[in-house]
Design a protein with these regions (language model features):
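Extreme N-terminus nucleophile/cap motif
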Residues: 7, 16, 203, 260, ...
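Glycine-rich phosphate/pyrophosphate-binding beta-alpha loops
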Residues: 245-254, 337-341, 351-363, 414-422
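Active-site rim segments in enzyme catalytic domains, especially the processed small/beta chain
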Residues: 40-66, 217-220, 348-411, 419, ...
Length: 430
């Protein structure tokens, strides 16, 4: 390959990665630049005010997982919050979402992406962010998928006047083929290139964030300034002679993918799993999640599903002809998430998943961004809203993954889709 291999969720996103690789950047430069461009071209799926996970596989070095998912703010029981539900119409069905100032968790995307660039990138940050600046100023043409998201998320995107100005610039909602421009976001990127993440978490940008959150939100200046990216050792397992690296706890997704692969790997059958067995593995994995990881606010509980005693219990279920698994669905969630995978010509691998939820409904006009609504996501708060026992990372299904063989990296992958992403990644690996 001349420059590398790239997979992303939108044409402009992928083009940014290509240009950065072409101009001498590595996979980490390209991934960081591509994600910032996706905040324009895939505005409804990700943003600086969301959270994510970046699995980096530097050539000739062990992979490392950069966890920059969102944190819960300090609990303030009894506080009056701007927190309310809306219905999003998907056509055949409607789904309830919770938004408002009280739905905003402490964002991690900006800190995380800039940390990865600082640790592993080789081009200047300004050069990495330039394509995203250009996309924001010149605009991107909305494709069918993004136009659909704008349509169904209209109640959230246009909840504030600033949102109306951005998505109804001529008085009507942007549609497929229209140009989406966000020059204020380009200005934010200029400030990040000049001042780094401090602008967003402690400087003038932080002031604008806190002003938007107001007194009916939970974020404070202190918790925003104290946000930290966590470098974790990836969850490592063997499957089919390959080595699988993925997102460890408090990610539920990476843990459950590893669990499912181990069920298949340790199954008594020597035959390649058929669709019936694969379905059974997925059902058992969902059951294990409910029975073993039921308190996802307890980070120590999540890895227990991989303990030998637990794994053997579910392996016995898999190896029987019939199963007594209670068939319950996972919490409903369509997911508003996107992913970028890159392998450069040197052999560096980058797998990064990011999200902004559905957005909290309030645009920060000066920055051109909408913060997340993670405190209003039912699948992230299964015990109820605003009930976390302490300030902590929220759990996530995100599972950026790298598969290696004897000759190095063989597969770089990940997915959006919330509860659906683990089954998608599992099937691709198999």
């Amino acid at each position: 390959m001349k420059y590398g291999a790239i997979a992303g969720g939108e044409k402009s996103t992928v083009q940014t990665a290509f240009e950065i690789l072409k101009n001498g950047g590595n996979a980490f430069d390209a991934a960081v630049g591509a994600v910032f461009t996706s905040m324009v071209s895939e505005f409804n799926l990700t943003g600086p005010g969301g959270g994510g996970a970046f699995l980096a596989g530097p050539v000739n070095a062990d992979p490392i997982l950069y966890d920059f998912f969102v944190d819960t703010p300090p609990s303030q029981p009894g506080k009056e919050l701007d927190f309310f539900s809306i219905l999003v119409d998907f056509g055949p069905s409607k789904q309830e979402f919770h938004i408002g100032q009280g739905s905003v968790a402490i964002p991690g995307n900006t800190a995380g992406l800039l940390t990865v660039h600082n640790r592993l990138g080789q081009l200047p940050l300004k050069a990495v962010l330039e394509p995203a600046m250009e996309a924001a100023r010149s605009g991107v043409i909305l494709n069918e998928a993004q136009a659909y998201l704008v349509k169904i998320l209209e109640p959230i995107l246009t909840h504030s006047k600033a949102g109306c100005d951005l998505f109804k610039p001529k008085g009507h909602l942007l549609n497929q083929g229209d140009r989406f421009q966000n020059p204020a976001f380009a200005d934010l990127l200029e400030m990040l290139a000049a001042e780094g993440a401090g602008y967003f978490y402690e400087g003038e940008g932080a002031g604008l964030i806190l002003k938007t959150i107001g007194q009916k939100g939970l974020m404070t200046r202190e918790c925003l300034a104290q946000y930290r990216v966590i470098e974790r050792q990836p969850l490592k397992s063997k499957f089919g002679g390959k080595t699988i690296y993925t997102n460890p706890a408090p990610s539920i997704g990476g843990t459950l993918i590893t669990f499912a692969l181990q069920l298949i790997e340790q199954s008594k059958s020597d035959e390649k799993p058929d669709l019936i067995k694969l379905l059974k593995v997925m059902e058992i994995t969902s059951a294990a999640r409910r029975e073993t990881c039921h308190d996802i606010q307890n980070e120590q509980q999540i890895p227990r599903v991989l303990e030998p005693e637990t794994l053997n219990h579910y392996l016995d279920l898999l190896n029987t002809d019939s199963t007594h698994i209670k068939n319950e669905n996972d919490p409903p969630s369509r997911g508003a998430t996107t992913h970028v995978s890159i392998l450069d010509k040197q052999g560096n691998a980058a797998s990064v998943t990011t999200t902004n939820g559905e957005g909290c409904g309030y645009m920060i006009q000066e920055l051109g961004i909408m913060l997340n609504n993670m405190l209003g996501e039912e699948d992230l708060n299964p015990m109820g809203f605003h009930l976390w026992p302490r300030q902590q990372r929220l759990p996530t299904m995100m599972a950026p993954t790298i598969v290696t063989g004897q000759n190095g990296v063989e597969l770089v992958l990940g997915s959006g889709g919330s509860n659906r992403l683990r089954s998608a990644i599992l099937q691709v690996i198999m």
